[in-house]
Amino acid sequence: MTKLSVNINKIAVIRNSRGGNLPDVIRAAQAIERFGADGITVHPRPDARHIRYDDVRNLKRVLTTELNIEGNPIPSFVDLVLEVQPAQVTLVPDAPDAITSNAGWDTMAHRDLLTGLTARFHERAIRVSIFLDPPPELVAGARACGAHRQHHDTQASPPHSPPHTSPPPRPLTPAPPPPRPPLPAPH
Protein backbone atom coordinates (compact mmCIF):
# COMPACT_ATOMS: atom_id res chain seq x y z
CA MET A 1 0.00 0.00 0.00
CA THR A 2 1.31 3.44 -0.92
CA LYS A 3 1.65 5.92 1.93
CA LEU A 4 2.40 9.64 1.86
CA SER A 5 5.03 11.11 4.16
CA VAL A 6 5.40 14.88 3.75
CA ASN A 7 8.83 16.48 4.08
CA ILE A 8 8.51 19.70 6.11
CA ASN A 9 12.07 21.00 5.72
CA LYS A 10 11.03 23.92 3.50
CA ILE A 11 8.61 25.11 6.18
CA ALA A 12 11.57 25.28 8.55
CA VAL A 13 13.63 27.16 5.94
CA ILE A 14 10.96 29.88 5.84
CA ARG A 15 10.80 29.98 9.65
CA ASN A 16 14.56 30.25 9.97
CA SER A 17 14.83 32.98 7.33
CA ARG A 18 12.33 35.12 9.26
CA GLY A 19 13.65 34.44 12.74
CA GLY A 20 11.25 33.54 15.50
CA ASN A 21 8.86 30.64 15.10
CA LEU A 22 6.65 31.53 12.15
CA PRO A 23 5.63 29.40 10.47
CA ASP A 24 5.55 26.96 13.37
CA VAL A 25 6.81 23.60 12.06
CA ILE A 26 5.02 21.69 14.82
CA ARG A 27 1.64 23.20 13.98
CA ALA A 28 2.31 22.74 10.27
CA ALA A 29 3.10 19.05 10.80
CA GLN A 30 -0.07 18.59 12.84
CA ALA A 31 -2.11 20.26 10.09
CA ILE A 32 -0.50 18.00 7.48
CA GLU A 33 -1.53 14.99 9.57
CA ARG A 34 -5.11 16.30 9.80
CA PHE A 35 -5.14 16.72 6.01
CA GLY A 36 -4.47 12.98 5.69
CA ALA A 37 -0.72 12.41 5.42
CA ASP A 38 0.52 9.08 6.73
CA GLY A 39 3.74 10.53 8.08
CA ILE A 40 6.12 13.45 8.43
CA THR A 41 9.67 13.42 7.05
CA VAL A 42 12.48 15.66 8.27
CA HIS A 43 16.14 15.96 7.31
CA PRO A 44 18.09 17.74 10.05
CA ARG A 45 21.51 18.89 8.94
CA PRO A 46 24.50 19.70 11.15
CA ASP A 47 24.28 23.42 10.30
CA ALA A 48 20.61 23.57 11.41
CA ARG A 49 19.64 25.62 8.36
CA HIS A 50 16.16 24.13 8.36
CA ILE A 51 14.89 21.36 10.64
CA ARG A 52 16.82 21.42 13.91
CA TYR A 53 17.48 18.56 16.31
CA ASP A 54 15.10 20.12 18.87
CA ASP A 55 12.38 20.26 16.19
CA VAL A 56 12.77 16.51 15.74
CA ARG A 57 12.41 15.89 19.48
CA ASN A 58 9.32 18.12 19.66
CA LEU A 59 7.74 16.51 16.60
CA LYS A 60 8.17 13.04 18.09
CA ARG A 61 6.20 14.15 21.17
CA VAL A 62 3.16 15.38 19.23
CA LEU A 63 2.88 13.40 15.99
CA THR A 64 0.19 10.76 15.66
CA THR A 65 1.57 9.37 12.38
CA GLU A 66 4.98 8.02 11.41
CA LEU A 67 8.10 10.10 11.77
CA ASN A 68 10.87 9.51 9.20
CA ILE A 69 14.23 11.11 9.95
CA GLU A 70 16.60 11.41 6.97
CA GLY A 71 20.26 12.24 7.22
CA ASN A 72 23.93 11.45 6.98
CA PRO A 73 24.77 9.02 9.79
CA ILE A 74 27.34 11.19 11.52
CA PRO A 75 27.58 10.41 15.26
CA SER A 76 25.25 13.25 16.38
CA PHE A 77 22.61 12.12 13.85
CA VAL A 78 22.83 8.48 14.95
CA ASP A 79 22.52 9.58 18.60
CA LEU A 80 19.43 11.66 17.75
CA VAL A 81 17.75 8.77 15.93
CA LEU A 82 18.46 6.34 18.77
CA GLU A 83 17.12 8.88 21.29
CA VAL A 84 13.94 9.80 19.38
CA GLN A 85 13.22 6.32 17.99
CA PRO A 86 11.23 7.31 14.90
CA ALA A 87 9.25 4.79 12.87
CA GLN A 88 11.88 5.07 10.12
CA VAL A 89 15.36 6.40 9.51
CA THR A 90 16.56 7.07 5.97
CA LEU A 91 20.34 7.00 5.65
CA VAL A 92 21.61 9.60 3.16
CA PRO A 93 25.29 10.08 2.22
CA ASP A 94 25.13 13.84 1.74
CA ALA A 95 27.92 16.23 2.57
CA PRO A 96 27.25 18.57 5.50
CA ASP A 97 27.17 21.59 3.17
CA ALA A 98 25.04 19.97 0.45
CA ILE A 99 22.03 22.05 -0.57
CA THR A 100 20.06 18.88 -1.24
CA SER A 101 20.76 15.18 -1.40
CA ASN A 102 22.20 14.54 -4.83
CA ALA A 103 23.67 11.04 -4.81
CA GLY A 104 22.88 7.75 -3.17
CA TRP A 105 24.98 5.27 -1.24
CA ASP A 106 27.28 2.88 -2.99
CA THR A 107 25.90 -0.01 -0.97
CA MET A 108 28.71 -2.30 -2.09
CA ALA A 109 31.55 0.01 -1.02
CA HIS A 110 29.83 0.98 2.26
CA ARG A 111 28.32 -2.39 3.08
CA ASP A 112 29.99 -2.80 6.49
CA LEU A 113 29.01 0.69 7.64
CA LEU A 114 25.41 0.33 6.45
CA THR A 115 25.03 -3.18 7.86
CA GLY A 116 26.29 -2.04 11.26
CA LEU A 117 24.01 1.00 11.34
CA THR A 118 21.02 -1.03 10.21
CA ALA A 119 21.62 -3.54 13.02
CA ARG A 120 21.83 -0.75 15.62
CA PHE A 121 18.55 0.78 14.45
CA HIS A 122 16.84 -2.62 14.27
CA GLU A 123 17.71 -3.16 17.95
CA ARG A 124 15.43 -0.17 18.70
CA ALA A 125 12.70 -1.37 16.28
CA ILE A 126 13.46 1.45 13.84
CA ARG A 127 12.75 0.67 10.19
CA VAL A 128 15.70 1.49 7.92
CA SER A 129 15.62 2.98 4.42
CA ILE A 130 18.75 3.61 2.38
CA PHE A 131 19.02 6.45 -0.14
CA LEU A 132 20.63 5.00 -3.26
CA ASP A 133 21.09 5.29 -6.97
CA PRO A 134 19.01 2.87 -9.07
CA PRO A 135 21.51 0.32 -10.49
CA PRO A 136 20.27 -3.19 -9.59
CA GLU A 137 23.49 -4.17 -7.83
CA LEU A 138 23.08 -1.24 -5.41
CA VAL A 139 19.46 -2.22 -4.77
CA ALA A 140 20.63 -5.76 -3.99
CA GLY A 141 23.34 -4.26 -1.78
CA ALA A 142 20.74 -2.34 0.24
CA ARG A 143 18.81 -5.56 0.82
CA ALA A 144 22.02 -7.32 1.85
CA CYS A 145 22.64 -4.57 4.44
CA GLY A 146 19.27 -5.36 6.04
CA ALA A 147 17.36 -2.28 4.88
CA HIS A 148 13.58 -2.58 4.88
CA ARG A 149 13.14 0.09 2.22
CA GLN A 150 15.03 2.04 -0.39
CA HIS A 151 14.77 5.71 -1.30
CA HIS A 152 15.92 6.11 -4.89
CA ASP A 153 17.81 9.15 -6.13
CA THR A 154 15.74 9.97 -9.21
CA GLN A 155 18.34 12.43 -10.52
CA ALA A 156 20.51 9.43 -11.32
CA SER A 157 17.73 7.47 -13.04
CA PRO A 158 17.85 6.85 -16.77
CA PRO A 159 14.77 7.93 -18.69
CA HIS A 160 12.02 5.34 -18.47
CA SER A 161 10.52 6.16 -21.84
CA PRO A 162 11.57 7.89 -25.03
CA PRO A 163 11.49 11.67 -24.99
CA HIS A 164 8.08 13.22 -25.34
CA THR A 165 7.38 13.54 -29.06
CA SER A 166 3.78 14.74 -29.12
CA PRO A 167 3.20 18.17 -30.57
CA PRO A 168 3.17 20.92 -27.97
CA PRO A 169 -0.26 21.76 -26.59
CA ARG A 170 -2.16 24.48 -28.39
CA PRO A 171 -2.40 27.77 -26.56
CA LEU A 172 -5.61 28.28 -24.68
CA THR A 173 -7.72 30.61 -26.78
CA PRO A 174 -11.46 31.00 -26.72
CA ALA A 175 -13.30 28.84 -29.21
CA PRO A 176 -14.65 30.77 -32.18
CA PRO A 177 -18.33 31.63 -31.92
CA PRO A 178 -20.71 29.25 -33.67
CA PRO A 179 -21.67 30.26 -37.21
CA ARG A 180 -24.66 32.57 -37.48
CA PRO A 181 -27.72 31.32 -39.29
CA PRO A 182 -28.07 32.79 -42.77
CA LEU A 183 -30.07 35.98 -43.07
CA PRO A 184 -33.44 35.64 -44.78
CA ALA A 185 -33.49 36.61 -48.46
CA PRO A 186 -34.78 40.14 -49.11
CA HIS A 187 -38.31 40.44 -50.70
For each feature predicted by the language model, list its residue ranges.
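N-terminal small/glycine-rich loop or linker at the start of catalytic domains
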Residues: 1-18, 95, 99-102, 114-115, ...
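Non-cysteine beta-strand/loop elements that form the S-adenosyl-L-methionine
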Residues: 3-9, 86-96, 147-155
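Glycine-rich tight-turn/loop motif centered on a GG-T
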Residues: 16-19, 64, 97-113, 155-169
